[in-house]
Amino acid sequence: MAPELKTEVNIISKVIQGDLESLPPQVREFIESNAKLCQPESIHICDGSEEENKKILDIMVEQGMIKKLSKYENCWLALTNPRDVARIESKTVIITQEQRDTIPIPKTGSSQLGRWMSEEDFEKAFNTRFPGCMQGRTMYVIPFSMGPIGSPLAKIGIELTDSPYVVASMRMMTRMGTAALKALGNGEFVKCLHSVGCPLPLKEPLINNWPCNPELTLIAHLPDRREIISFGSGYGGNSLLGKKCFALRIASRIAKEEGWLAEHMLILGITNPEGEKKYFAAAFPSACGKTNLAMMNPSRPGWKIECVGDDIAWMKFDELGNLRAINPENGFFGVAPGTSIKTNPNAIKTIFKNTIFTNVAETSDGGVYWEGIDEPLPPGVTLTSWKNKDWTPDNGEPCAHPNSRFCTPASQCPIMDPAWESPEGVPIEGIIFGGRRPAGVPLVYEAFNWQHGVFIGAAMRSEATAAAEHKGKIIMHDPFAMRPFFGYNFGKYLAHWLSMAHRPAAKLPRIFHVNWFRKDSQGKFLWPGYGENSRVLEWMFNRIQGKASAKSTAIGYIPADTALNLKGLEDINLTELFNISKEFWEKEVEEIKQYFEGQVNADLPYEIERELLALEMRIKQL
């Protein structure tokens, strides 16, 4: 007979899988107190097995939450409520006693570097949402490891959720189940609580059989208590709490305390024709090609690129002073639109088995489709859009949601690095920052030193497709590509990065900035991008080896005249690609100054202020 969990309100939650008695006391207490609060009908402790996964998928099919894609092996399609399609920054908060622990106090207006909520306001919000929120549903207990199980850099979390979609996705995105629980023992874990906020019986029918509660959505982080509490959204970024919530917001705070870095960065290995290998980490804002770079097929003969991770890096200096990085994830949660054989052949080779697609279009022959897939539809095959309606190009709107996703196991990617799961991590020798800058910013430049490199990360800006009320594109500040993900005050984060230079024996990686997106006066890209970006990586590789020459400019080192290998490329206008215009950079300096003064204000480290002044002086002398 399954053990029953008695609660004060006499709601009984049956344990339908697993054994509460055998769990570590602090895990059991976490489950019991939340079961008492949320009142699920049953409790399922996940073991991560293949058999369990089949059961979870069957439950979702039965609920109409996913459907099988007959064209591929073990692939599924979920269509969400159109109001639950992305991360929601306005509803993502961090709770600390003091506002300044979370964000710098801006000079005027509100902070763009995070959202703080007071403990009192959070308590009220929590109490209006969670009591009874899982009635009629199963509470799944998901023990998971961020990072290879047993790695000294890994951390354990436990997520309680009432969404089977979260269970199936977390099984791909993390190392989930019994092994994670064993690794935890009686240790510390990050407590993650998630509910879609739709107790049964429903008050109103679901849209697309997708439970969510957009009015009451809230994603809250309590770094002092190592807790994440998410309500009302089933979408990945808000519900797969190991991803941005834990691996960036909570982890960046843990990293500050423990002396390491948790960053929004891909990790790749690059090997030259002589068989020498180096690892790079790279931070780009969303939609600037992180996944494409991490999985690139280099155009340069004899060069090889392998992928360690496409989104998040945890990096710590070892005893020898090497900066060691792990990918804390176990899968890819990638944006589907724009993914094609041309833009990312290795992603295409990864995603057509054991994958959950969300909000892409479906073909009448049981396949998937999206903008930029670059595959003509076979004759007679029709499309159903992500809104579950018949679709033709005349509809005037995209067939797949612009933020539609694939969730797929990393182990299926044909170019995973042999060391991608190595417990000690891979040694990072170069860090790359980048953004989408149509004007003014050269293809590549190198920082003069670590401090200058930290300044470059802090000053990152990138073109964003603005919300509907703006016409055209705007250039947004996105420092370190972490703007939506800082777990604590950005000024203190900069100080933490700067402090790495004072570590005894630290071998500091070189820092670079790239811009694949510069355009000419006709609006055409000046650089072909994709596999040709390997030429830029080749220059960086050779710089680290002390082999490639560079010339010093006002903004950093750029490749000397013949240092960038352009063999086999036609019509590359190097002059325009590397032009550093005084007028442009004067405006850029002014923009950065306003941003630092307005947003980071009193918390801006003086070293960063000094770097800005030095840049201003160098620009004046152009």
UniProtKB/Swiss-Prot annotation:
The lineage of its organism: Eukaryota, Metazoa, Chordata, Craniata, Vertebrata. Regulates cataplerosis and anaplerosis, the processes that control the levels of metabolic intermediates in the citric acid cycle. At low glucose levels, it catalyzes the cataplerotic conversion of oxaloacetate (OAA) to phosphoenolpyruvate (PEP), the rate-limiting step in the metabolic pathway that produces glucose from lactate and other precursors derived from the citric acid cycle. At high glucose levels, it catalyzes the anaplerotic conversion of phosphoenolpyruvate to oxaloacetate. It comes from Gallus gallus. GTP binds at A287, C288, G289, K290, T291, N292, R405, R436, Y530, G531, E532, N533. It comes from the Eukaryota. It is found in: Cytoplasm. Its cofactor is Mn(2+). Residues 457-487 are annotated as: Omega-loop. The keyword Manganese applies. GO terms for molecular function: epinephrine binding; GTP binding; manganese ion binding; nucleoside diphosphate kinase activity; phosphoenolpyruvate carboxykinase (GTP) activity; protein serine kinase activity (using GTP as donor). Mn(2+) binds at K244, H264, D311. Belongs to the phosphoenolpyruvate carboxykinase [GTP] family. GO terms for biological process: adult feeding behavior; alanine metabolic process; aspartate metabolic process; cellular response to cAMP; cellular response to dexamethasone stimulus; cellular response to ethanol; cellular response to fructose stimulus; cellular response to glucagon stimulus. The active site is at C288. Its main location: cytoplasm. Keywords: Cytoplasm, Decarboxylase, Gluconeogenesis, GTP-binding, Kinase, Lyase, Manganese, Metal-binding, Nucleotide-binding, Phosphoprotein, Transferase. The modification Phosphoserine is found at S90. The gene is PCK1. The keyword Cytoplasm applies. Substrate binds at R87, Y235, G236, G237, S286, N403, S404, R405. This is Phosphoenolpyruvate carboxykinase, cytosolic [GTP]. In eukaryotes there are two isozymes: a cytoplasmic one and a mitochondrial one. It catalyses: oxaloacetate + GTP = phosphoenolpyruvate + GDP + CO2; L-seryl-[protein] + GTP = O-phospho-L-seryl-[protein] + GDP + H(+). Its EC number is 4.1.1.32, 2.7.11.-.
